């Protein structure tokens, strides 16, 4: 059985640290992609009293949040109109991505005789989604004056927040500042928000009314220097499995698909029942590490869909069937932390955690 063990205490402590850091700004906690792989329901249930909003990517994720908490939920993605009636009935916040969305939402709201809560996404430079910057004020004005929309927020997203010295950050901030000025001229109550984790840590003065710290809440820090208080944030999860078999190789024998790993005489291997079918990175095969009884062991051979093997050498530490295997550590400096795994596989921690699928059990401890 493979288990992602999540520390409730660490999770809640991370959020408290962030709240202290952002001062009076509201906190919108992103729980998209199954709470970055940690499990939406468990994460929401254990944090709803600490945050102001939750944020997700689509309608189906939003419904999972509203099933366990009463906090406002913002959907970042496009509006799927097949779900819009349920979204409106549950007061889920939609993101207006272009001017035409307003008329569509008004028509549906009239039919339901219920107003729609909306945030307007403005494209200030990421050039992916959102209302064009040059059309922002017209769209904001139109939504604000609508009898059927409650314009709750206006937001944008930084394209290069992970590089705090990138000139695009200043360009986007300046554009957003002009939008904030226009918006606040309509109403001081409209929530303006721009920053994700890297945004408010790397750039001063861009917390605005609300921040959206996703990866930071789960315990992953940017590599650039951050405040000493933020350094107290820690990863909240460990991925664990069990040794299910010990095998002994003779010299020249191989293991796994294509037998690319060749053992030495009397080398012992431990078989671990987790593979890329569980969302664990296949690229780790033959180069990753796992922790068994506080000793690091290298993976041996190709990872399969349902399993991997690690070399125990001559097994001088007496690893046995049933011993716990730590595949992802909550200690960032360890060779099997999400940070280290991301470096080994040329990706980011978000990817490592969010691809862990439902074959892995989530357990809050």
From Swiss-Prot:
It catalyses: L-alanine = D-alanine. The keyword Isomerase applies. Its cofactor is pyridoxal 5'-phosphate. Its EC number is 5.1.1.1. One of its GO terms (biological process) is D-alanine biosynthetic process. InterPro entries: Ala_racemase, Ala_racemase/Decarboxylase_C, Ala_racemase_C, Ala_racemase_N, PLP-binding_barrel. The active site is at 32 (proton acceptor), 257 (proton acceptor). One of its GO terms (molecular function) is pyridoxal phosphate binding. The modification N6-(pyridoxal phosphate)lysine is found at residue 32. Gene3D superfamilies: Alanine racemase, Lyase, Ornithine Decarboxylase, Chain A, domain 1. Keywords: Isomerase, Pyridoxal phosphate. One of its GO terms (cellular component) is cytosol. Substrate binds at residues 128, 305. Disulfide bonds: none annotated. Pathway: Amino-acid biosynthesis; D-alanine biosynthesis; D-alanine from L-alanine: step 1/1. Belongs to the alanine racemase family. Catalyzes the interconversion of L-alanine and D-alanine. May also act on other amino acids. This is Alanine racemase. The gene is alr.
């Amino acid at each position: 059985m493979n288990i992602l063990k999540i520390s409730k205490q660490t999770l809640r402590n991370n959020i408290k640290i962030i709240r202290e850091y952002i001062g009076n700004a509201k906190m919108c906690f992103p729980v998209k992609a199954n709470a970055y792989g940690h499990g939406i329901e468990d994460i929401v249930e254990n944090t709803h009293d600490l945050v102001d909003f939750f944020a997700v990517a689509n309608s189906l994720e939003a419904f999972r949040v509203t099933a366990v908490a009463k906090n406002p939920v913002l959907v970042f993605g496009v509006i799927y109109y097949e779900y819009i009636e349920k979204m409106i009935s549950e007061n889920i916040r939609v993101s207006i991505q272009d001017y035409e969305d307003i008329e569509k939402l008004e028509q549906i709201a009239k039919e339901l005789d219920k107003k729609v809560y909306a945030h307007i996404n403005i494209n200030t430079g990421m050039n992916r989604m959102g209302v064009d910057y040059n059309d922002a004020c017209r769209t904001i004005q139109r939504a604000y004056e609508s009898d059927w929309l409650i314009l709750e927020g206006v937001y944008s997203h930084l394209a290069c927040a992970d590089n705090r010295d990138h000139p695009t950050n200043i360009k986007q901030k300046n554009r957003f500042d002009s939008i904030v000025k226009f918006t606040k001229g309509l109403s001081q109550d409209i929530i303006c928000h721009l920053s994700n984790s890297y945004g408010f840590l790397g750039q001063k003065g861009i917390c605005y009314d609300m921040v959206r710290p996703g990866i930071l809440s789960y315990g992953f820090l940017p590599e650039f220097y951050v405040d000493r208080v933020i350094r107290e944030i820690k990863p909240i999860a460990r991925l664990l499995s069990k040794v299910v078999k010990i095998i002994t190789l003779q010299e020249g024998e191989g293991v796994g698909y294509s037998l690319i790993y060749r053992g030495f005489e009397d080398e012992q291997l431990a078989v671990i029942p987790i593979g890329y079918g569980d969302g664990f990175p296949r690229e780790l095969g033959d180069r990753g590490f796992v922790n068994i009884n506080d000793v690091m062991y290298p993976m041996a051979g190709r990872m399969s869909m349902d399993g991997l093997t690690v070399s125990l050498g001559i097994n001088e530490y007496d690893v046995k069937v049933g011993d716990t295997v730590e595949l992802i550590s909550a200690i960032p400096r360890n060779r099997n932390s999400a940070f280290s795994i991301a470096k080994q596989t040329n990706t980011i921690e978000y990817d490592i955690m969010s691809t862990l699928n439902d074959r892995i059990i989530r357990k809050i401890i």
